[in-house]
């Protein structure tokens, strides 16, 4: 990565800081300036959310207050959830965050959990996600990559999550608007802001909090600790939380078919740990200057079994097995930041915030194939029950091992292990002869580990040369020893080279072999943010201006690891390769046998993607102009300059396989010779060089310059009526994999396309809101038009050219490429309302009723449905709060309509042999009832209880249904019968409990 250089933003800050000295006027400080007193601490200084002034959150005490009785009319297409609301609704993950939001759902990703959000007909990378102004990891969105790899569970191709306990506020913005976050906000954006010490120190100079919780749906336990304090000019916050649980249990989980394969009815078993630590340390030398150093880390670790993996030898879990597919996945995020805030009023700003952040995100999928370590494992099998006692091998009865030539049931004489009465030992499966192996003792064969065997005493061996010879039992002294790394080994060497002396051991490896594949997707970001606000009056018109910029460098790379090794050796496992015939130690290079214990192998790092560094330079401004008491206008503009710079360095960067790119654009030179079939013969060096030349050809710089805008108006003709309109534009630049991903195979070749254009969206929306002390009722109509959608297009059959213009291959290649092809339109209507019953009936003070509703419909060009559109959804809420907030409760009734066949599209319907393109397995309509309550027996203790799916309804969400794959090895069902679909159903009746104490 190139050096993180200063840009024009840094110089403007330096100029502004100089100006702040000259224009500092303490007597004219605004009322919300920070001081060392808690009552004046602002909790919502501008971040890189880049919202205009009218959209800035009002200062709130997010811990002590609850917006459950808030009558403020909602902003158009926007939902804001404070920490108190998240706590009240017992939100523990992204699914809970949008549980009672209509028009927003979480994208399901099977074994890897969730992957971002779906809003307005688009999902994942088309819905921006930021944490404290930093974009979170994007998925590899190339459709070609998804078709090749996503159905097989080899990549954790998901968007990372956040820890809910650390959040000050979560804002969900629906509709295209890149003024706020830049690239990615096509369907909307989800913006998170973390807490700091000021949010806790509103009444005193210290705070201690502890929270414990439990959820039955996934058996998740929560422990969270919060420490905050202030001393003179310093304040600090430490928050640590740990969640430990299991898989989300589907409906009727306990009675589901516990088998392997795609027809499995139970959710695959996983042990999931989520751990988060947020540390912020601040220094305020004066009331106008504040410096903060912060560290925000989040780790999600999941281990378990892919029992639903389709490539299994048997559906029965309790049968003998060679290996089982294990998962060991993680998502890790770490952000270290430095922030400077200035609240001195100058001609250029009222508030200034300058921050530098360094974030690293890793999403890892690790698959390990091994047996679980019991006697059913082939590598541990010991059917004869041979034992090691006092350094000697004995039979299952504890007697010395006896080997005889015995006639078997087929009339053939074979070596068999017998008891002291010369009767062959029985075995549960197979034959006695197959259950043991005679290890030949000699310097070039088998050595005993003297830390396990007693090498000072004679050992029993059997002399025979062929398997049909009567073995001769002997006791021999181990006459050859050697020492390796301080460990002693011994064997026996006969004076007659024709003699063969064998030691009887179980016929298995004696250790646990493990094959692994580990795929890392790494996103590294270095970013500078500058955000300023200024309130001023021009020609008697009030303006609230926010402006600033971003300079960021982001590197996206893939690192693949693979290999095998052995572990957990038993007493009979080989511990050394022995010596060669030349009397030197035998090495793994010389040994042709597979031995993961003695010769583990870890492949060199590889990749399917060229690493790409993305440089983003952005400038923005947003102004809320109050033209009249009844009319205000919002104007927003943003300019983004985004450059992609591939960074493939041969020998340093993880290697891209030569066969994926060779001859793709640059042909091989004329061959020096031909094989016996007349095919040209190239040296490995020629092939390597040609692959590097093709990568260099593919790795071209790409630059995008985009303008975004947002126009809005708010009209209040009456004190109870508000009309809002909004017209905004969003965009998403192609991801690096969409531009550069390359794959060469006769059946499926993908070409890179550096000529793609950014996707665009234009959003039109109008909202009508009635509001008063009794509450509010708001309805809005929206339409979003998308263009330049990126999709995978079939280019036909082609043949690569050789150096003289002829065909390079014997057969044509089926060629695909990412291109801008589709347009789309989504339209719909939403309702959001709240009624305070106490306004009409004094005795019912504290009661409220709410209602939310979303209906949307969308089509791509060619009348193709958009699968990311949610079915019609409504949420009715009934709540109560004690006037002193000692207790309260909420009842939610959610109704979701069925997903109609005409509103779904299966892009693989022809390959599956279907006549129509509708998705075969869809969600039906369902109604859910949830009840949540809290009680504060004393001021500093809060107890919460929630019951979800109160009526124990069996239901399948559309997001879960559309996560079912039509091909591959993971997330499958029997498409013909539907067997296995129960695994995708949501939990039945489940509960959440929590207790929190604060001081």
Curated annotation (Swiss-Prot):
Domain TBDR plug: 68-195
Disordered: region residues: 25-52
Residues covered by the TBDR beta-barrel domain: 203-999
Region (6 X 4 AA tandem repeats of P-T-N-Q): 26-49
Signal sequence range: 1-24
Start and stop residues of the Sequence repeats: 26-29, 30-33, 34-37, 38-41, 42-45, 46-49
GO terms classed as biological process: siderophore transmembrane transport
The protein's name in its UniProt record: Probable hemoglobin and hemoglobin-haptoglobin-binding protein 4
Source organism of this protein record: Haemophilus influenzae (strain ATCC 51907 / DSM 11121 / KW20 / Rd)
Motif (TonB C-terminal box): 982-999
General remark: This protein is subject to phase-variable expression associated with alteration in the length of the CCAA repeat region. This mechanism is called slipped-strand mispairing. Addition or loss of CCAA repeat units would change the reading frame and result in introduction of stop codons downstream of the repeat region. This may be a mechanism of regulation and a way to avoid the immunological response of the host.
Entries under PROSITE patterns matching the protein: TONB_DEPENDENT_REC_2, TONB_DEPENDENT_REC_3
Taxonomic path: Bacteria, Pseudomonadati, Pseudomonadota, Gammaproteobacteria, Pasteurellales
Function of the protein: Acts as a receptor for hemoglobin or the hemoglobin/haptoglobin complex of the human host and is required for heme uptake.
Similarity comment: Belongs to the TonB-dependent receptor family. Hemoglobin/haptoglobin binding protein subfamily.
Annotated Pfam families: Plug (PF07715), PT (PF04886), TonB_dep_Rec_b-barrel (PF00593)
Cell compartments where the protein resides: Cell outer membrane
């Amino acid at each position: 990565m190139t050096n993180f250089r200063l840009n024009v933003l840094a110089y403007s800050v330096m100029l502004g800081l100089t100006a702040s000295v000259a224009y500092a006027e303490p007597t004219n400080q605004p009322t919300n300036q920070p001081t060392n007193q808690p009552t004046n601490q602002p909790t919502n200084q501008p971040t890189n959310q880049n919202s205009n002034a009218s959209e800035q959150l009002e200062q709130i005490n997010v811990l002590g207050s609850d917006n459950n009785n808030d009558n403020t009319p909602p902003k158009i297409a926007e939902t804001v959830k404070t920490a108190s609301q998240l706590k009240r609704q017992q939100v523990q993950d992204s699914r809970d965050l949008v549980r009672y939001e209509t028009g927003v759902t979480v994208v399901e990703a099977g074994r890897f959990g969730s992957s971002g959000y779906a809003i307005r007909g688009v999902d994942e990378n088309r819905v921006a996600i930021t944490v404290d102004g930093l974009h979170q990891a994007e998925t590899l969105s190339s459709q070609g990559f998804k078709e090749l790899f996503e159905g097989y569970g080899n990549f954790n191709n998901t968007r990372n999550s956040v820890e809910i306990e650390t959040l000050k506020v979560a804002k969900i913005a629906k509709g295209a608007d890149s003024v706020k976050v830049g690239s990615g906000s096509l369907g909307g954006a989800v913006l998170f802001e973390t807490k700091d010490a000021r949010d806790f120190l509103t009444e005193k100079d210290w705070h201690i909090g502890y929270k414990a919780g439990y959820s039955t749906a996934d058996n998740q336990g929560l422990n969270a600790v919060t420490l905050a304090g202030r001393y003179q000019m310093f304040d600090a916050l430490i928050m640590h939380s740990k969640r430990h649980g299991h898989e989300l249990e589907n409906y009727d989980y306990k009675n589901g078919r516990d088998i392997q394969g795609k027809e499995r009815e139970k959710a695959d078993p996983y042990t999931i740990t989520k751990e988060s630590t947020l540390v912020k340390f601040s220094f305020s030398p004066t009331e106008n200057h504040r410096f903060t150093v912060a560290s925000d880390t989040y780790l999600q670790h999941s281990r378990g079994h892919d029992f639903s993996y389709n490539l299994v030898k048997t559906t029965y879990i309790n049968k003998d097995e060679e290996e089982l597919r294990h998962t060991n996945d993680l998502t890790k995020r770490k952000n270290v930041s430095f922030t400077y805030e200035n609240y001195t009023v100058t001609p250029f700003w009222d508030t200034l915030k300058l921050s530098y952040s360094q974030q690293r995100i890793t999403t890892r999928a690790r698959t390990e194939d091994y047996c679980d370590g019991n006697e059913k494992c082939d590598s541990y099998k010991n059917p004869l029950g041979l034992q090691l006692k006092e350094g000697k091998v004995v039979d299952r009865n504890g007697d010395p091992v006896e080997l005889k030539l015995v006639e078997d049931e087929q009339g053939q004489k074979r070596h068999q292990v017998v008891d002291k009465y010369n009767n062959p030992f029985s075995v549960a499966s197979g034959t006695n002869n197959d259950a043991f192996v005679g290890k030949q003792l000699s310097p070039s064969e088998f050595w005993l580990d003297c830390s396990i065997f007693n090498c000072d005493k004679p050992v029993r061996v059997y002399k025979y040369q062929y398997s049909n010879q009567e073995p001769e039992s002997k006791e021999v002294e181990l006459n050859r020893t050697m020492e390796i790394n301080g460990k002693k080994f011994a064997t026996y060497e006969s004076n007659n080279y024709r003699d063969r002396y064998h030691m009887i051991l179980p016929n298995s490896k004696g250790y646990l072999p493990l094959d692994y594949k580990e795929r890392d997707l790494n996103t590294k970001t270095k970013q500078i943010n500058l955000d300023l606000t200024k309130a001023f009056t021009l020609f008697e018109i009030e303006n609230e201006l926010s402006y600033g910029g971003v300079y960021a460098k982001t590197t996206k790379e893939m690192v693949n690891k693979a290999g095998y090794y052995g572990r957990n050796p038993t007493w009979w496992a080989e511990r050394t390769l022995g010596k060669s015939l030349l009397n030197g130690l035998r090495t793994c290079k010389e040994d042709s046998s597979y031995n993961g214990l003695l010769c583990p192998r870890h492949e060199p790092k590889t990749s399917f993607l060229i690493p790409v560094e993305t440089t983003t330079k952005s400038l923005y401004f947003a102004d809320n102009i109050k033209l009249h008491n009844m009319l205000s206008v919002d104007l927003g503009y943003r300019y983004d300059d985004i450059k992609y710079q591939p960074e493939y360095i041969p020998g340093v960067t993880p290697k891209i396989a030569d066969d994926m790119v060779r001859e793709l654009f640059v042909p091989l030179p004329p061959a020096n010779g031909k094989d016996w079939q007349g095919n040209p013969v190239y040296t490995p060096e020629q092939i390597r060089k040609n692959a590097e030349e093709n990568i260099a050809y593919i790795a071209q710089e790409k630059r995008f310059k985009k303008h975004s805008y947002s126009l809005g108006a708010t009209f209040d003709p009456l004190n109870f009526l508000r009309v809002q309109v909004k017209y905004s534009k969003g965009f998403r630049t192609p991801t690096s994999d969409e531009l550069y991903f390359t794959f060469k195979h006769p059946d499926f070749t993908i070409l890179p396309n550096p000529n793609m254009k950014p996707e665009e969206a234009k959003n039109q929306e109008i909202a009508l809101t009635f509001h008063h002390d009794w509450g509010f009722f708001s309805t809005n109509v929206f339409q979003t038009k998308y263009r330049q959608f990126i999709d995978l297009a079939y280019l036909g059959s082609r043949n690569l050219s050789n150096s003289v213009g002829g065909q390079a291959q014997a057969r044509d290649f089926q060629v695909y490429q990412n291109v801008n092809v589709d347009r789309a339109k989504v339209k719909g209507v939403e309702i959001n309302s709240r009624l305070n019953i106490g306004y009409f009936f004094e005795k019912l003070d504290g009661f409220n009723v709410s209602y939310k509703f979303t209906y949307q419909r969308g089509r791509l060009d060619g009348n193709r449905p958009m699968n990311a559109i949610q079915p019609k959804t409504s949420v009715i809420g009934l709540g109560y709060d004690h006037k002193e907030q000692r207790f309260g409760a909420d009842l939610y009734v959610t109704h979701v309509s069925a997903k109609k066949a005409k509103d779904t599209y299966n892009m693989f319907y022809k390959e599956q042999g279907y006549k129509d393109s509708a998705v075969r397995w869809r969600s039906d309509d369902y109604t859910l009832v949830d009840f949540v309550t809290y009680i504060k027996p004393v001021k500093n203790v809060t107890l919460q209880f929630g019951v979800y799916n109160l009526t124990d309804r069996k239901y399948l969400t559309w997001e879960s249904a559309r996560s079912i794959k039509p091909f591959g090895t993971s997330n499958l069902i029997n498409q013909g019968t539907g067997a296995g679909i129960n695994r995708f159903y949501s939990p039945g009746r489940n509960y959440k409990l929590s207790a929190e104490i604060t001081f």
